């Protein structure tokens, strides 16, 4: 069954997500970009709050929307984020010439790294093939431009199916604990297609917020999403709140 990853920006949102049925807690600042990073102090506070509350859910955090060069800056940020106590560190991998060197360097980090392939310009087959041959904790596909629709508006289902199949069948990831996930402005209405793809996890932010992805996490929307993912309710979202 596909697990539910919910992206949060604060202690309060993290506790709401944990209580509302999230299987993964993902830490990022939506107002700072697709993979916007949170301050290190906030990462430490959220991890401590979840563990103090008794939650053992896996926690991931992004390093922020950093360019892959200079590589030293990326690796320094990876180490700093990992030191905050998160279980996984997510790093965006755009389709550019620096991706191969970045993937090789990230694979050597003493942390559980999840490269996140940015799908807006398409996936470079050679970059995905390289990543699948390296000992990463998992691989994801996501979108950068959240105003361009959901992931399904950027990649068609056959391409997504091929991505998931390649992650699961290739290199050190095959038969291991490596995870294959999808994200990218996913909506409640996308759930039938998400279920059909059966990724290990699917990431949500916009669908569980009041207003856009920069708004506050909405417990009612989270409950509706959780129930819908498990087939408990029809796929109809809560009514939109009127904006002032």
Each model region followed by its residue ranges:
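C-terminal alpha-helical cap/extension of soluble enzyme domains
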Residues: 69, 181-244
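Catalytic cores of alpha/beta
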Residues: 9-20, 66-83, 122-133, 186-201
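N-terminal amphipathic alpha-helix/helix-capping segment at the start of soluble metabolic enzymes
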Residues: 1-7, 47-48, 243-244
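Glycine-enriched alpha-helix->loop->beta-strand junction motifs that scaffold or abut catalytic
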Residues: 20-25, 82-88, 108-113, 132-138, ...
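Catalytic beta/alpha-barrel core
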Residues: 5-9, 25-36, 62-64, 86-100, ...
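Active-site-adjacent beta->alpha loops and helix N-cap segments on the catalytic face
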Residues: 31-50, 68-74, 93-110, 121-127, ...
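P-loop/Walker A phosphate-binding loop and immediately adjacent motor/lid segment at beta-alpha junctions
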Residues: 39-57, 156, 160, 168, ...
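Short beta-strand/loop segments at the ligand-binding rim of alpha/beta enzyme cores
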Residues: 1-4, 53-67, 109-119, 163-183
